[in-house]
């Protein structure tokens, strides 16, 4: 019996329910793409009230990528005109170190202006709780 796997899903909506099927909160990668002028873009979790915001203006074609490094530090890069730069300094000082909590996370891509030109994509790996055999030795 063959079972298919869902690798991605595209929806046009102001609210996006991202379901974390795992047992633990997990970091995620978000890409904010601009199809026009977008002022102070942000991602908001309507369930928890947390947000990650930026004090910047995105131009058409710009991409902000928010992710965690291999040492679990928050990182941000801006790709503008084909040039990639470190954009950590653009973070709004009131931003939260957001994770996707187990269950439903209702996220929105928001902006002070130009929100209709902002497109967000979210990716993550769910985590399960367990004990590794080598830990029990």
Write out the residue ranges for each language-model feature:
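Intrinsically disordered, low-complexity segments enriched in serine, threonine, and glycine
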Residues: 2-137
């Amino acid at each position: 019996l063959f079972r298919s796997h869902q690798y991605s899903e595209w929806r046009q909506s102001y609210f996006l329910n991202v379901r974390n099927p795992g047992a633990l909160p997990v970091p995620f990668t978000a890409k904010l793409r601009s199809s026009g002028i977008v002022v102070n873009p942000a991602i908001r979790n309507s369930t928890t009230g947390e947000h990650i915001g930026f004090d910047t203006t995105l131009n058409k074609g710009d991409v902000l990528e928010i992710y965690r490094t291999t040492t679990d530090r928050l990182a941000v890069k801006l790709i503008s005109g084909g040039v990639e730069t470190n954009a950590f300094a653009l973070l709004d000082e009131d931003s939260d170190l957001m994770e996707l909590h187990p269950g439903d996370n209702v996220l929105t891509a928001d902006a002070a202006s130009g929100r209709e030109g902002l497109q967000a994509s979210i990716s993550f790996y769910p985590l399960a709780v367990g004990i590794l055999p080598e830990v029990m030795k």
